[in-house]
From Swiss-Prot:
This is S-ribosylhomocysteine lyase. Its EC number is 4.4.1.21. Binds 1 Fe cation per subunit. Homodimer. Keywords: Autoinducer synthesis, Iron, Lyase, Metal-binding, Quorum sensing. Involved in the synthesis of autoinducer 2 (AI-2) which is secreted by bacteria and is used to communicate both the cell density and the metabolic potential of the environment. The regulation of gene expression in response to changes in cell density is called quorum sensing. Catalyzes the transformation of S-ribosylhomocysteine (RHC) to homocysteine (HC) and 4,5-dihydroxy-2,3-pentadione (DPD). It catalyses: S-(5-deoxy-D-ribos-5-yl)-L-homocysteine = (S)-4,5-dihydroxypentane-2,3-dione + L-homocysteine. One of its GO terms (molecular function) is S-ribosylhomocysteine lyase activity. InterPro entries: LuxS_sf (IPR037005), Metalloenz_LuxS/M16 (IPR011249), S-ribosylhomocysteinase (IPR003815).
Length: 157
């Protein structure tokens, strides 16, 4: 079986950052998959499930309600390894093109004070598994990277 692209990245050299994971074209439409890497794989502790779940709910809601990006957002969700998120967007983008959007997103999560979107029994399959305080903590740690982003945080090793 052919190895998928994400398994060809050397995770021993991967830093937190923003990376273009892949670009796909379907019927002349380009989709860019962004690797929002919050943790250094196999070095830092993974994001606890309740925090990653909360970031997913708030992040997806904020992105789909962003006036500039709403029509371009296809998907926002956690990686199975719990070291970050994937963002799939319509269009041909590079990592640097997403710095402002992703910085805005995680700043909004740090300052989020409303009820967690979609966190009721009717709206979520695991509605009790949320932790807003830890979501804010993980987001604030990631913002430290974003606020001082370097080339090594924008290009896969």
């Amino acid at each position: 079986m052919k190895k998928i692209t994400s398994f060809t990245i050397d995770h021993t050299k991967l830093n937190p950052g923003i990376y273009v994971s892949r670009k796909d074209t379907f019927e002349n439409v380009i989709f860019t998959t962004i690797d929002i890497r919050i943790k250094a794989p196999n070095i830092e502790p993974i994001i606890e499930n309740a925090a990653i779940h909360t970031i997913e709910h708030i992040g997806a809601t904020l992105l789909r309600n962003n006036e500039v990006w709403t029509e371009k957002i296809v998907y926002f969700g956690p990686m199975g390894c719990r070291t970050g998120f994937y963002l799939i967007i319509f269009g041909n983008y590079e990592s640097k093109d997403l710095i402002d959007l992703i910085s805005w997103l995680f700043s909004e999560i740090v300052n989020f004070s409303e009820p967690i979107p979609g966190a009721s029994h009717k709206e979520c399959g695991n509605y009790k598994d949320h932790n807003l305080d830890m979501a804010k903590y993980e987001s604030s740690k990631y913002l430290q990277i974003l606020n001082n982003i370097k080339e090594e945080n924008l290009k896969y090793p």
